[in-house]
Curated annotation (Swiss-Prot):
Motif PDZ-binding positions after renumbering to this chain: 1005-1007
Assembly information from the UniProt record: Tetramer; dimer of dimers. Interacts with EML2, MAGI2 (via PDZ domains) and AP4M1. Interacts with BECN1, GOPC, GRID2IP, SHANK1 and SHANK2. Interacts with CBLN2, but not with CBLN4. Interacts with CBLN1 (via C1q domain); the interaction is CBLN1-NRX1 complex formation-dependent; CBLN1-binding is calcium-independent; CBLN1 hexamers anchor GRID2 N-terminal domain dimers to monomeric NRXN1 isoform beta; promotes synaptogenesis and mediates the D-Serine-dependent long term depression signals and AMPA receptor endocytosis.
Reported impact of I26A: Reduces binding to CBLN1. Abolishes CBLN1 binding. Abolishes synapse assembly. Abolishes cerebellar parallel fiber-Purkinje cell synapse formation. Abolishes D-Serine-dependent long term synaptic depression at PF-PC synapses
Signal peptide: 1-23
Site residues (Essential for dimerization), renumbered to this chain: F76
Domain description: The PDZ-binding motif mediates interaction with GOPC.
Residues bound to Ca(2+) 1: E531, V534, D535
Source organism per UniProt: Homo sapiens (Human)
Name of the featured protein: Glutamate receptor ionotropic, delta-2
Transmembrane segments: 567-587, 636-656, 831-851
InterPro entries: ANF_lig-bd_rcpt, Glu/Gly-bd, Iono_Glu_rcpt_met, Ionotropic_Glu_rcpt, Iontro_rcpt_C, Peripla_BP_I
Result of changing F76D: Monomeric form. Does not dimerize. Weakly interacts with C1q domain of CBLN1. Forms intermediate synapse. Abolishes cerebellar parallel fiber-Purkinje cell synapse formation
Length: 1007
């Protein structure tokens, strides 16, 4: 420190001596440096000395210069010193100051037309912030920015995105202008990252002590979690002190990951920062190209650089600042521009300019000199130095260095990648050492049983449970690749985790927060609330909300045979049968047909109805209809019956083989609009919180989620919600309920249900994903995420998905119809109604038969005796009449009533053969004959009533016409009987004798 004032005085004297000694030089430049930029002045003088010794550039001309120092925060002083330099006459002005004074010098240079080469400098090595110099659109800006623009915010954003950080804290020192990362803060806020800011005071020890004194234990623990991810924007000296303090006070552990970003970090600073830190450290700094050939490190084209600046082993070169390098390259650039002007013989002499005089004119050669400088370019210590159209240097490169996770101090550091504005990030930031060193590591894994993500595959008493599922397959893939082992257990409360009133977490997330587990895996969705307390890998499967509903069951309709026609149509058909039967009877009654030989049926109303019904069911009828009107009626009826029966047959076949039972709920909107089926989800789950936040949003008051929340929140959520997913699935299967849950879980349940009784609906928008949860700041997250991405890229993840969610499962996921129903075979349920109708007919017929039997027995008890009710023995009468007809004088013979033997006849019983023949029914007729019986006998005649013949089962025939009988004449001919009296022969049934008609083929009658 005692030598420094002497050197300063010596340098000022040397500067004045140089100026006076070269007063006749035509090349003179001025320099303004910050008071703290002593190295800039030293490097500036070294650069001028190197160029004056190089005869190939300026040949016989020498560069002279004037240097002055100003307060970086005093713009007035900077302008005053610049005016003094312009008054001396300069070709260009070089400045290494802060942004405050740079703006004033920019205005002065523009006014006086003096090229101004500005090297931005920050205080004490603190990272730069953008100066924001105003650029004119008229291309009359005489200020050129030698240092590239500030790209720190772009580099930080790229690195943070690569590391997939979601929550971190930024520490910055008191000298840093926080506005320098305002653009970065805006971008991370748009991406949903949680970023905290904290200013680091100069007295770091006092700041740390204050934290311990003012924070409670819970707050201090949360602060420790925050420090696991941190970005340090401060000068190297402050960063070293801060890291030392937090490590010694145990505020950070080996699982922390810090990023230090500063352009001014040199190799010595890197080694010191790595030595003091624990955990993982990433360093971002500006880097410059170095020739691979050691012998060429100090040569740039035809110019040789002083070895004190280019030799990496030189102590001065090791501690140079970024601004020192740009100072040297600026002098080299000016020397080449002067050389160009001398060669082109377009030299403009220097002019003494006065800033004080009102009518002072700018330098006439300023524009030409500025264009020569802008078009030129050199290769120096910083690489290629050139200017773009906007007057800035676009060439910049950043180097990203990093260490591996570890507790030991003094770990090695390696280059992870590099960044530039053109190509972006080149390289991988993955911790390769961590990937290779997980062999033998045993991780404790917490899970929640959820099909098909995690399921118990084997549970043997006395042995650890074995698990299977999609998440277990993913975990095994990571384990096989990285080489770690794991022990798995189920969360004590079987929950995924939600925040409690006291700020703690329960469930799977709570196990990670309290550090009882290293990894949490199941059907765990990535949510902002969970990301605040734990870290997540990249998603390994997309997530969406679905609804599980019970497929509508096929109802057992015993009378499915009646389904093809509507009830009203059946009523019309039944009425039509009655109406047509009545019309047929009336038509035959109005115009009775002639009696046909051999026909023994009559057209009663009963027979007409029976005939119409028989023809309708295609069974035919017994009554012949010969009238034209009746036949036209029956023709129309048969056509009607043909169409109806054909339509019924076709419709019945289609109805019994294909049954469609479609549900009215096919989307979440349909579910929210109805109230017949209650629905809910798992209490305090991610789905529950998602619906709650959406439903309580005032901007979505009438939306789908608000309607869903009203249903889910009934009775404070206890009415329609369940405590775990399996309870919700069982509630759907055995009740009227819809379960809202993860679509992947519900699809697996629907696919593998033995009865195929479920179907799912849902939202296909994958706004979230399933991820592996780790402790906040876990060193394993990055390598896990990298491996998951590799599994997705090579298709292994899709293979695992198809294993648990096959495309062609045994059940249809989205159809509310039972697709397992066969279309060809009909079961007993489909025809149960037909058997019921048959059974009803049998029961009814048996009941009627019993009634008839009872009625006949009751009627038989009241039949009169033989003495009171006798009938004529028709066979005896037949023989007597035949004998009379063969007598010659029978026509004139008189006989008395007593000559006729009235013998009771029993016609109740008939021989078997006789019963099989068609026998006329005389119940509604009587036999009228013309006979020769004397009129005295006719008084005994009476009509054969239906009552008398009730036991004689004859068919119905038309009534015989009354007329005279013919009898055989003695000569064998026939003649009309002289007695033409018409009389009736009465008869009554007798229960004792049978009547044998037609057994004797030789028997005949003339009646």
């Amino acid at each position: 420190m005692e030598v420094f004032p002497f050197l300063l005085v010596l340098s000022v004297w040397w500067s004045r001596t140089w100026d006076s000694a070269n007063a006749d030089s035509i090349i003179h430049i001025g320099a303004i440096f910050d008071e703290s930029a002593k190295k800039d002045d030293e490097v500036f003088r070294t650069a001028v000395g190197d160029l004056n010794q190089n005869e190939e550039i300026l040949q016989t001309e020498k560069i002279t210069f004037s240097v002055t120092f100003v307060d970086g925060n005093n713009p007035f002083q900077a302008v005053q010193e610049a005016c003094e330099l312009m008054n001396q006459g300069i070709l260009a002005l070089v400045s290494s100051i802060g942004c405050t004074s740079a703006g004033s010098l920019q205005s002065l240079a523009d006014a006086m037309h003096i090229p101004h080469l500005f090297i931005q400098r920050s205080t004490a090595g603190t990272p730069r912030s953008g100066c924001g110099l105003t650029r004119s659109n008229r291309n009359d800006d005489y200020t050129l920015s030698v240092r590239p623009p500030v790209y720190l915010h772009d580099v930080i954003l790229r690195v943070v995105t690569e590391y997939a950080w979601q929550k971190f804290i930024i520490f910055y020192d008191s000298e840093y202008d926080i506005r320098g990362i305002q653009e970065f803060l805006d971008k991370v806020s748009q991406q949903g990252m949680d970023v905290a800011l904290q200013k680091v005071e100069n007295n770091i020890n006092k700041m740390i002590t204050t934290l311990f004194d003012t924070m409670r234990i819970e707050e201090l623990n949360r602060y420790r979690d925050t420090l696991r991810r941190a970005i340090l924007v401060m000068n190297p000296a402050t960063a070293k002190s801060f890291i030392t303090e937090v490590v010694e006070t145990n505020l950070v552990a080996f699982d922390c990951h810090w990023i230090i970003i500063n352009e001014e970090i040199n190799d010595v600073d890197v080694q010191e920062l790595v030595r003091r830190s624990i955990g993982r450290l990433t360093i971002i700094r500006q880097t410059f190209p170095v020739p691979q050939n050691i012998s060429q490190r100090c040569f740039r084209g035809n110019h040789r650089i002083s070895s004190t600046l280019c030799d990496p082993k030189d102590p001065f070169a090791q501690n140079m600042e970024i601004s020192n390098l740009y100072i040297y390259d600026t002098v080299l650039l000016l020397a080449n521009a002067f050389h160009k002007k001398l060669e082109d013989r377009k030299w403009h002499s220097m002019a003494s300019l006065s800033c004080i005089r009102k009518n002072s004119k700018p330098w006439q050669g300023g524009r030409s000199m500025l264009e020569t400088i802008k078009k030129g370019g050199v290769s120096g210590l910083t690489g290629e130095l050139e200017f773009g159209e906007n007057g800035g240097n676009p060439n910049v490169h950043f180097e990203i260095l990093g260490t591996n996770y570890g507790e030991e101090l003094g770990r090695g550091v390696r280059k992870l990648g590099c960044w530039n504005p053109v190509t972006g990030l080149n390289g991988s930031l993955t911790d390769k050492k961590l990937e290779n060193n997980m062999r033998g590591v045993v991780l404790r894994v917490v899970t929640v049983l959820e099909e098909p993500f995690v399921m118990v595959s084997e549970n043997v008493l006395g042995k650890p449970k074995k698990y299977q599922g999609f998440s277990i397959d993913v975990l095994d893939a990571l384990s096989n690749y990285l080489g770690f082992n794991y022990e798995i257990y189920v969360a004590p409360d079987h929950k995924y985790g939600s925040p409690q009133e006291d700020g703690t977490w329960n469930g799977l997330v709570g196990e990670l927060v309290f550090k009882r587990a290293d990894i949490g895996i199941s059907a765990l969705t990535i949510t902002p609330d969970r990301e605040n307390v734990v870290d997540f890998t990249t998603r390994y499967m997309d997530y969406s909300v679905g609804v599980l509903l019970r497929r509508a069951e096929k109802t057992v309709d015993m009378f499915a045979c009646l389904a093809p026609f509507d009830l009203s149509l059946w009523a019309c058909i039944a009425g039509t049968v009655l109406l047509v039967g009545l019309l047929v009877y009336l038509l035959n009654w109005l115009n009775p047909p002639r009696l046909q030989m051999g026909s023994m049926t009559s057209t009663t109303l009963y027979n007409s109805m029976w005939f119409v019904y028989g023809s309708f069911v295609q069974q035919g009828g017994e009554v012949p209809y010969t009238t034209l009107a009746t036949r036209m009626m029956m023709g129309a009826w048969w056509l009607f019956a043909l169409i109806v029966i054909s339509s019924y047959t076709a419709n019945l076949a289609a109805f019994l083989t294909i049954t469609r039972i479609e549900s009215s709920i096919q989307s979440l909107q349909d579910l929210s609009k109805q109230t017949e089926i209650p629905y809910g989800t798992v209490l305090d789950s991610a789905v529950y919180e998602h619906v709650r936040m959406k439903g309580l949003n005032p901007f979505e008051r009438d939306s789908m989620y608000s309607q869903m929340w009203r249903m889910i929140n009934r009775s404070n959520g206890s009415e329609n919600n369940v405590l775990e997913s399996q309870a919700g699935i069982q509630k759907v299967k055995y009740g009227n309920y819809a379960f809202v849950w993860d679509a992947a879980v519900l699809e697996y349940v629907a696919i593998n249900d033995p009865d195929c009784s479920f179907y799912t609906i849902g939202n296909t928008v994958a706004d979230r994903g399933y991820g592996i949860a780790l402790q906040h700041g876990s060193p394993y997250r990055d390598v896990f995420s990298q491996r998951i991405l590799e599994l997705q890229q090579n298709g292994d993840m899709d293979i695992l998905k198809h294993k648990w969610w096959p495309k062609n499962g045994q059940c249809d996921l989205y159809s509310s119809v039972d697709t397992k129903q066969k279309g060809g075979a009909l079961d007993i349920k489909s025809f149960a109604g037909v058997f019921c109708i048959l059974a009803a007919g049998i029961v009814l017929s048996c009941f009627i038969a019993m009634l008839e039997t009872w009625w006949n027995k009751r009627k038989g008890s009241r039949v009169p005796s033989k003495e009171d009710d006798k009938e004529i023995d028709l066979e005896h009468l037949h023989r007597r009449v035949n004998s009379l007809c063969t007598d010659d004088d029978s026509p004139h013979k008189q006989f008395s009533t007593s000559s006729i033997d009235l013998t009771p006849l029993d016609i109740d019983t008939l021989p078997t053969r006789q019963a099989l023949e068609q026998i006329s029914d005389f119940r509604n007729t009587h036999i009228t004959t013309t006979t020769f019986i004397p009129e005295q006998i006719q008084t005994l005649s009476r009509t054969l009533s239906a009552k008398a013949a009730s036991g004689f089962t004859f068919g119905n025939v038309p009534e015989h016409r009354t007329g005279p009988f013919r009898h055989r004449a003695p000569n064998g001919g026939f003649f009309r009987s002289p007695i033409k009296t018409m009389s009736s022969i009465p008869y009554q049934p007798t229960p004792t004798l049978g009547l044998n008609l037609g057994n004797d083929p030789d028997r005949g009658t003339s009646i």
